[in-house]
């Protein structure tokens, strides 16, 4: 437990440092660089794309797993999602419509799960820095206070089980981003 606490403290300090920097490049390379800078010395694979396929038993899915990108398609999938987002215009969208789109982009990037560990924290830092490029005031506080909800919202945004009537939805992620960006006060519950 002590090693986990030390890791969390190191990474938390690095998150604060990265978010304090006024630098950003919208690219897959930036995502990899953020991961490396967050986890260097913590994970030996910091900043490197995972070389194997994964599944993770999720509490919120009663032990089922999201289907993540195959390891041999991560680079191409990231490039596709970034290209698609670069082509998207936020011009003429309300802030609420922008929140909905940002939630979808965030869930798409997270679903790729390019790293062995640290995907949610890396995605959070990347998305905060990306949102700031739109002039949005974003802090890590809502992410830190509701990190488990954020992760579960990402899981639900990427999970389908038609047999049980479950469809992927960004609804919960939109509530999270609405609290973050629109000063709403939705109750963020994991159940």
Regions from the PLM with identified roles:
Residues 1-191:
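FIC/Doc superfamily catalytic core
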């Amino acid at each position: 437990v002590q090693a986990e606490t030390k890791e969390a403290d190191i990474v938390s300090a690095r998150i604060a440092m990265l978010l304090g920097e006024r630098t950003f490049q919208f690219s897959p390379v930036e995502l990899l660089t953020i991961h490396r800078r967050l986890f260097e010395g913590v994970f030996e694979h910091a900043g490197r794309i995972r070389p194997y396929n994964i599944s993770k038993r999720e509490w919120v899915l009663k032990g089922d797993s999201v289907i993540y990108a195959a390891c041999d398609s991560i680079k191409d999938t990231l490039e596709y999602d970034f290209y698609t987002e670069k082509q998207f215009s936020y011009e003429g969208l309300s802030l609420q419509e922008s929140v909905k789109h940002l939630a979808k982009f965030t869930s798409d990037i997270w679903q790729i799960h390019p790293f062995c560990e640290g995907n949610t924290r890396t995605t959070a830092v990347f998305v905060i820095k990306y949102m700031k490029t739109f002039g949005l005031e974003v802090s890590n506080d809502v992410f830190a206070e509701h990190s488990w909800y954020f992760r579960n919202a990402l899981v639900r945004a990427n999970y389908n089980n038609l047999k049980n009537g479950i469809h992927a939805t960004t609804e919960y992620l939109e509530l999270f981003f609405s609290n973050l960006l629109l000063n709403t006060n939705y109750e963020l519950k994991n159940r």
